[in-house]
């Protein structure tokens, strides 16, 4: 699998099949305008632009803006990022670990309640403010045992912490799933 195919796979996992299709079209071109991409992929232009912006925020694509001399509006030309994939994956790993660790800390250090009927979760303060009844269905709230969630988060942190995005590691194993 080459770098462009790997980026397309990542985009697909993050944003769905349309993102993968966009990346594959970009991989076979130097630059493509969002208008041409929308036509090629038969996508709604606003939907495509949102997807391109999501891919840009994830650092998977780049763009160039040029003024159309005839109408004075800007046209955007998109291409696959030239940033090394290992750097993108390392940064994403670091960000994801940070988020998972914050969620773990919240789960370990806070008491929560759950509605046995609809499954809505509440913090202690929210439960107290609602007199321990569910805002959605009126059922009496029960303490929530989050032991399973805590263990799952710890396992995900361990797996991701041990994952190495370097090319030699990727050849031998896939991204771990928690």
UniProtKB/Swiss-Prot annotation:
The keyword Ribonucleoprotein appears for this protein: no
Entry keyword rRNA-binding: no
UniProtKB keywords: DNA-binding, Transcription, Transcription regulation
A molecular function GO annotation: DNA binding
One Pfam family named in its UniProt record: Zn_Ribbon_TF
Quaternary structure note: Monomer. Interaction with RNA polymerase subunits RpoF and RpoE is necessary for Tfe stimulatory transcription activity. Able to interact with Tbp and RNA polymerase in the absence of DNA promoter. Interacts both with the preinitiation and elongation complexes.
UniProt-recorded name of the protein: Transcription factor E
Species in which this protein is naturally found: Thermofilum pendens (strain DSM 2475 / Hrk 5)
């Amino acid at each position: 699998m080459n770098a462009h195919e790997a980026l397309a796979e990542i985009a697909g996992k993050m944003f769905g099949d349309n993102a993968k299709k966009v990346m594959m079209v970009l991989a076979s071109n130097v630059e493509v305008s969002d208008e041409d991409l929308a036509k090629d992929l038969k996508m709604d232009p606003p939907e495509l632009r949102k997807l391109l912006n999501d891919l840009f925020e994830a650092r998977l694509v780049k763009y160039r803006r040029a003024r159309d001399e005839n109408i004075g509006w800007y046209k955007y030309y998109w291409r696959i990022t030239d940033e090394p994939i290992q750097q993108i994956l390392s940064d994403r790993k670091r960000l994801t670990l940070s988020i998972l660790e914050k969620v773990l800390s919240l789960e370990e250090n806070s008491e929560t309640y759950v509605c046995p009927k609809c499954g809505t979760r509440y913090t202690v303060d929210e439960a107290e403010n609602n007199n321990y009844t569910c805002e959605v269905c009126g059922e009496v709230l029960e303490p929530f045992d989050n032991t399973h969630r805590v263990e799952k988060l710890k396992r995900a942190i361990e797996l991701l912490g041990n994952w190495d995005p370097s090319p030699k590691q990727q050849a031998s194993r896939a991204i771990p799933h928690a």
